[in-house]
Amino acid sequence: MLKTNQKNVHAFEIEKQEPEAVMEFLEKNHALLQYFLIIFKYDIEPEVKVILHKHQLLFLETNRPLNGRHIKTMSLKEETNHSKPNHSKTEPKTTIYERHIRSGEEIYSANHLIFLGNIHNGAKIISEGCVSVYGVCEGAIVCFGECLILKEVKSAQIVFQNKILSLKEVERLLVNKNIKIITKNDDILDIKEVL
């Protein structure tokens, strides 16, 4: 009997563009991209493949359309213009972790997640819901929810709604220990500090 395992995968789809832009993206974000399948919607150039192999990134070349759930956010203006609420979609539950998340520990969840302890370097959090971290965050965070709340950040490995935070955006999180709320309006990332 054939032994198989079924896995859920988060992926980045890359459309056809200049190889230099793709190589720069891969070099800059290779540490975070190790957690994703990278799907190229075209035949990859040899120089791009060199970067993929160099960082041992998992990738797929295909022209076939892929089914799956696309992460789509609705602006606050669109949300408030609805005349009646949509109750057909169930709201994710909230899971609270009062303990520290240790190095090497991985948490995958469809729920909203609240962390009262620290997330240590080498830990990985992936959530379909919102994520709130009130301890020190040194690990990798991948949040597909409406918002990401962070207090003391010491990590550059943060993905919010399929966008890898740039060094400039991460630096805004590192300046102090105040709570920061990250949201996204269209493709614009908004980082607000709560005093």
UniProtKB/Swiss-Prot annotation:
Keyword Kinase: no
UniProt KW keywords: Cell cycle, Cell division, Septation
Membership in a protein family: Belongs to the MinC family.
Protein purpose: Cell division inhibitor that blocks the formation of polar Z ring septums. Rapidly oscillates between the poles of the cell to destabilize FtsZ filaments that have formed before they mature into polar Z rings. Prevents FtsZ polymerization.
PANTHER family (UniProt xref): SEPTUM SITE-DETERMINING PROTEIN MINC
NCBIfam families in UniProt: PRK00556.1-2
Subunit relationships: Interacts with MinD and FtsZ.
Name assigned to this protein: Probable septum site-determining protein MinC
